[in-house]
């Protein structure tokens, strides 16, 4: 291990971070008032951090002006009570740097970055991309490995290499492969805070040492997510944590395996009494039958029985 590359973990991000939905009006415009109220509600439920403009937040469907408004509204709602980590993904290094600098200037605590979509950069190109962003900002970077969406897989050895960059402090691992979490912790857990990015392996991830969980279903069941973290990480009451996790699992599995993650998250929010609108087209709202499935899954845990 290269001791020179070790980084301080003082004030580190940890806990449950909501991959924040972007509420939409009937016509497809962003509902900023609802976004602010929804973010405040999540913080009130004990969520430790907010991640606007991620996959669940439909960043790919928003223009630059809308992205800025989402950040401003989220930061105002958070009011320093919870860190805001902005998704700043884009198709080019130039745009990622611009979005990341904007996030820093607005007051975000960090940025979350996946590989640029569609262009399929090779690993040497990807390293140069992250290095350029690293050199352009002074806030932490959370790497985001989600090859199912980006087409580029960042294996643990490559992430270990990226950990040598000053601002690279965290990684959200979203392949759903538990060995990835353990290998990241083994290779660079002393330098990177590892976050689970796949809902169905959250409990196992906590048990082996993940510092947190970035999830979209946090929008739906925030109190349950926070309680699971408290039981598994803070209290180490694994019996109670397992019981709660098994109650949440039908919902988590339906979301992860249904092929309509964003659509289902938004539909489930409505079932829970918080109408955040439909996804922006080309995605469509969940069907009546799908909503019935979601309702039955939600009822398996105490928080979801109000659906």
Spans of features found by a protein language model:
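Catalytic alpha/beta core domains of metabolic enzymes, predominantly
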Residues: 135-136, 147-249, 255-256
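Alpha-helical structural signal in soluble globular domains
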Residues: 45, 69, 73-78, 102, ...
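A general structural signal for well-ordered alpha-helical segments in protein cores
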Residues: 35, 67, 71, 96, ...
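C-terminal alpha-helical cap/extension of soluble enzyme domains
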Residues: 2-5, 12-21, 41, 45-47, ...
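Short secondary-structure transition/capping segments
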Residues: 62-65, 98, 123-126, 154-156, ...
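Active-site beta->alpha loop and helix N-cap motifs at the rims of alpha/beta catalytic domains
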Residues: 2-151
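Generic structural "secondary-structure junction" signal
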Residues: 22-26, 61-64, 120, 148, ...
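Secondary-structure boundary/capping positions in well-ordered alpha/beta enzyme cores
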Residues: 81-82, 140, 169, 191, ...
């Amino acid at each position: 291990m290269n001791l020179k590359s070790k980084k301080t973990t003082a004030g580190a991000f940890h806990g449950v971070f909501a991959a924040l939905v972007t509420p939409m009006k009937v016509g497809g415009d962003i509902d900023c008032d609802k976004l602010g109220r929804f973010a405040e509600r999540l913080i009130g439920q004990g969520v430790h951090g907010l991640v606007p403009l991620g996959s669940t937040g439909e960043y790919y469907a928003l223009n630059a002006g809308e992205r800025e408004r989402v950040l401003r509204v989220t930061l105002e709602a958070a009011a320093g009570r919870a860190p805001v980590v902005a998704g700043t993904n884009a198709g080019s290094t130039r745009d990622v740097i611009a979005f990341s600098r904007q996030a820093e200037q607005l007051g975000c605590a960090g940025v979350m970055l996946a590989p640029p979509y569609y262009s399929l950069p090779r690993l040497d190109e990807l390293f140069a991309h992250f290095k350029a962003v690293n050199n352009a900002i002074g806030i932490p970077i959370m790497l985001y490995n989600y090859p199912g969406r980006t087409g580029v897989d960042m294996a643990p050895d490559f992430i270990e290499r990226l950990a040598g960059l000053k601002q690279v402090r965290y990684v959200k691992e979203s392949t759903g492969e538990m060995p990835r979490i353990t290998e990241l912790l083994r290779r660079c857990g002393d330098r990177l805070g590892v976050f689970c990015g796949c809902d169905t392996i959250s409990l196992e991830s906590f048990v082996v040492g993940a510092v947190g969980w970035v999830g979209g279903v946090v929008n739906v069941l925030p109190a349950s997510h926070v309680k699971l973290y408290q039981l598994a990480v803070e209290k180490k009451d694994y019996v109670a944590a397992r019981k709660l996790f098994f109650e949440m699992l039908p919902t988590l599995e339906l979301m992860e395996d249904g092929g309509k993650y964003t659509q289902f998250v938004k539909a489930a929010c409505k079932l829970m009494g918080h109408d955040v609108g439909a996804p922006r087209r080309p995605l469509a709202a969940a069907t009546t039958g799908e909503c019935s499935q979601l309702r039955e899954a939600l009822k398996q845990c105490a928080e979801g029985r109000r659906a």
